[in-house]
Regions:
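A short, structured active-site edge motif that brings together acidic residues
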Residues: 45-46, 50, 77, 135-143
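Helix-loop "lid/cap" segments that line or gate small-molecule binding pockets
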Residues: 33-34, 54-71, 129
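Short alpha-helical
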Residues: 25-28, 54-57, 103, 124-125
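Metal-dependent phosphoesterase signature
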Residues: 62-103
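Short, acidic loop-to-helix structural element flanking the phosphoryl-transfer center
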Residues: 6-7, 88-117, 123-127, 131
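Hydrophobic "anchor" residues on beta-strands that sit immediately upstream
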Residues: 10-12, 116, 141
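Active-site neighborhood of HAD-like aspartate-dependent phosphohydrolases
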Residues: 2-49
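Conserved H-loop
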Residues: 40, 69, 111, 135-140
Length: 143
């Protein structure tokens, strides 16, 4: 089957790593979370390698010393709550819109396309980030 090459009017765009670089804010939240549960904070490099599959997976890997972990016990729940609170407080630490994003979004809008941001960030943090960075003027929602 050949791909359908018709123009699409709806564009779904990933937030982290595509529209924004947020690793510094995530790292800051991981450090605060680690302190709250009494473990060594992860390095920036570890966080950079470990993000992308959601906060539950990231928190689990930190608690398990870098290994994949499916555990969602009370310790994990406490750490996840600490991470979520810390991220709301420090997501701005180094979070920035990537080069060329505003121009690309403006071009999509001027072509009559609708853009929606896809993210696995918690809703409150995602809403705040999109609004604060000015991405909300180009998109019709988050998924």
């Amino acid at each position: 089957m050949s791909p359908d090459r018709r123009r699409r009017d709806l564009v779904l765009i990933d937030l982290d790593g595509t529209l924004i670089d947020s690793v510094d804010g995530i790292h800051a939240a991981c450090a605060r979370m680690s302190e709250s549960v009494g473990i060594e904070p992860p390095s920036l490099e570890f966080v950079h390698r470990s993000i992308g599959r959601g906060a539950d997976v990231l928190v689990g890997k930190i608690l398990a010393g870098g290994r994949e972990s499916e555990s969602r016990d009370a310790r994990h729940q406490k750490a996840r709550a600490a991470f979520d609170q810390a991220y709301l407080e420090c997501w701005q630490d180094g979070t920035r819109v990537r080069q060329g994003v505003f121009e690309t979004l403006e071009a999509l809008v001027s072509e009559g396309r609708e853009a929606i941001i896809a993210t696995n960030k918690p809703g409150r943090a995602a809403d705040e980030i999109v609004r604060h960075l000015g991405l909300d003027r180009f998109v019709s929602g988050l998924a």
